[in-house]
Amino acid sequence: MSARSSVRDGATVAALCACVAACSTTHKPEADPARLVPIMKAMDKNTPTPGGAPTCTPDQMIGGATMTQVTLLKISGEPANPGPEREDWINPAELDSPAARELIDPATDETTRRQAAYELLSAPFFLVYRIDNVDAPMALGIKDLKRGTVGSRVLRYDTQGDIVCVKVMNFQSSLAKSDWAILKSNLAVMDPKIAAELRTDLHEQMLKYVRALGRPEQP
């Protein structure tokens, strides 16, 4: 083989390798995040009254894009009403699909935002965790010595933002943590450290209930 032929063959191999490398780099599909805004606004508007929608079965709550009501409002650009129901500790980030988190993170670059928008728009349905009432005075720093209770619902919407079904999800502070807090609350005002412990406990109780959503109902 001549030197010229060897150089030519080497160049051909290098070009082929470059082509393979370029072709193997898949570009994730993108979509305009603005397309999500009317869907999110429709979902917020179509929040049903209690008893105003069918009850979701366990299998209806598996496979969609998930998010908290707070995240829904952030994506839609609508402000959240003030109150404990919209605070971060009871609207945990763990309940958001990664794509939803990326959309509301101010540090996300534009390409990633567009890829996240495409992913959400491709979801078969949306599952929204909505906190309706936080009756947990000790967790909120108020000295009212009773066990904390949170009323919430899991709302399934179709891809247009219309309600499909609802699952009521009410939960309480763990009895052990609640009793501990009552025993320790011997001051005139609520100890902020105890209140923080109770918020963490309610956060954990919520995640425990969420993990059980797709399981069959107990007889």
Regions inferred by a protein language model and the residue ranges of each:
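Charge-rich, solvent-exposed alpha-helical interaction surfaces
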Residues: R35, I39-A42, A116, D201, ...
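A structural "domain/chain start" motif
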Residues: S24-A107
